[in-house]
């Protein structure tokens, strides 16, 4: 696990409380493996230990920053109703891949097949954009339906040509297919995990209410911000490196020009 390089976070336990991140499921609907993340039982509900959650978020921030630093991509997965819109929005903001509709089997383990579906979508788009020359209205209508269906399922992974360096899931119980594929390939999985989930397949657990929109949004916003900040850091560093290299090249160039001048000057004196 990544070391805690960030001592401060843009969120606090108070923020998590206000977002309802501490509310687990009813005590009758729980996974005993989540016991270590539970603070207490209250009115038939399990209450999640937010002190642990905050530390998990701190670790998660360091992890996503490390993934970005290694120039690897991140795949966000959340197909439940509460997560869809915010997951798509934040993934696009931070420039990472996402799946917020149906998980297509083989999205990770059979990526070549998914790439074929993307190519099919591109062919359809090209044909429709040229006016569907030579096609009947019915054929154009069928193509348009195929286009809409493919776009819906593939829009967030169209440019994903190799497996990501990290998969982040909202509710691993619902996204068990994505988790299983990531585990099979040895891709680390980070998950927003509620008290009814099995945390074992999740390498980086964030124990929280994975049903409340505010809870999901708060945590994903924090991760997205960390990704954006790290990418900006890399850009600034790369820019400084480029400026340093240019300055060094200019210094060397000036040095060589001076040497050439002195040699030419000496040669002119010798001719006299």
UniProtKB/Swiss-Prot annotation:
GO terms for molecular function: structural constituent of ribosome. The gene is rpsB. This is Small ribosomal subunit protein uS2. The keyword Transferase does not apply. GO terms for biological process: translation. Belongs to the universal ribosomal protein uS2 family. It comes from Protochlamydia amoebophila (strain UWE25). Residues 255-272 have a biased composition (Basic and acidic residues). Pfam families: Ribosomal_S2. It comes from the Bacteria. InterPro entries: Ribosomal_uS2, Ribosomal_uS2_bac/mit/plastid, Ribosomal_uS2_CS, Ribosomal_uS2_flav_dom_sf. SUPFAM superfamilies: Ribosomal protein S2 (SSF52313). Residues 238-272 are annotated as: Disordered. One of its GO terms (cellular component) is cytosolic small ribosomal subunit. Keywords: Ribonucleoprotein, Ribosomal protein.
């Amino acid at each position: 696990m990544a070391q805690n390089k960030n001592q401060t976070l843009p969120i606090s336990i108070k923020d998590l409380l206000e977002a309802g991140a501490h509310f687990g499921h009813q005590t009758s609907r729980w996974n005993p493996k989540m016991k270590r993340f539970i603070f207490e039982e209250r009115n038939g509900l399990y209450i999640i230990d937010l002190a642990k959650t905050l530390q998990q978020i701190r670790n998660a921030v360091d992890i996503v920053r490390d993934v970005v630093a290694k120039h690897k991509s991140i795949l966000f997965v959340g197909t439940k109703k509460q997560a869809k819109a915010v997951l798509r929005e934040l993934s696009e903001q931070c420039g990472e891949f996402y799946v917020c509709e149906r998980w297509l089997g083989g999205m990770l383990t059979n990526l070549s097949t998914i790439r074929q579906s993307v190519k099919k979508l591109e062919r359809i788009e090209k044909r429709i954009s040229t006016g569907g020359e030579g096609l009947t209205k019915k054929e154009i209508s069928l193509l348009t339906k195929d286009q809409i269906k493919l776009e819906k399922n593939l829009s967030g992974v169209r440019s994903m040509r190799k497996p990501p360096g990290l998969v982040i899931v909202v509710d691993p119980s619902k996204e068990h297919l994505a988790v299983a594929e990531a585990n099979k390939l040895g891709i680390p999985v980070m998950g927003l995990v509620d008290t009814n989930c099995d945390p074992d397949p999740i390498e980086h657990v964030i124990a929280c209410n994975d049903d409340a929109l505010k809870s999901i949004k708060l945590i994903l916003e924090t991760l997205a911000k960390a990704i954006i900040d790290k990418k900006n850091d890399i850009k600034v560093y790369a820019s400084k490196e480029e400026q340093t290299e240019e300055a060094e090249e200019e210094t060397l160039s000036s040095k060589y020009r001076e040497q050439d001048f002195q040699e030419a000057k000496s040669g002119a004196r010798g001719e006299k």
